[in-house]
Amino acid sequence: YIVKIPEAGKFEFLDSGWMDEVTKGRLRGELSDKQYAERIESIKRFERQLTDNGYLVLKLFFQIGKKEQKKRLEELEGNKDTAWRVGENDWWQNKHYDKCEEVFDKYLTDTNASVAPWYIIDSGDKKWAELQVLETLCSGIHVAMQNESLAVPILQNVFPLVKMPKLSEVELDREISEEEYKKELRHLQKKL
């Protein structure tokens, strides 16, 4: 999933990354419990190696409600310029939303660690989601820059979990006015 690790001071953004393979494998019944556990341990080990070597790992999960997801899929599919972005898998996930949420919840819980935490982004409102992402990036970078050591000691494969809400508990009805959005966006862009 990472062809080349970025050099110091550079960013790498992954869309889905190794999460996609594991969650789709579970949803399709292609990964046994043993294979799933092995993949989870491999992911945690890799993320720990990155953080041990001074990399900042921030994982964002964009949570959206079933109705809003369906609405956006219909809008994308209804536009000839964006229709290509919607596939059978997208509609399958919307139809089986609860099952998908359960699999994603387990994956997020199993791969959430203090060295590489998950941040659940309420994506019901696109502008609100954008601000949450910027705030998360700013906070993560700020904390990382305060850390005087580039590497943290290895703690014998202990991956403490960070408290995280269940996906079904995330508020998905937040909205922000255009004026508030622009003000907060300017603030976060300066901060970043």
Task: Enumerate the language-model features and the residues they cover.
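Glycine-rich phosphate-binding loop of ATP-dependent small-molecule kinases
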Residues: 1-191
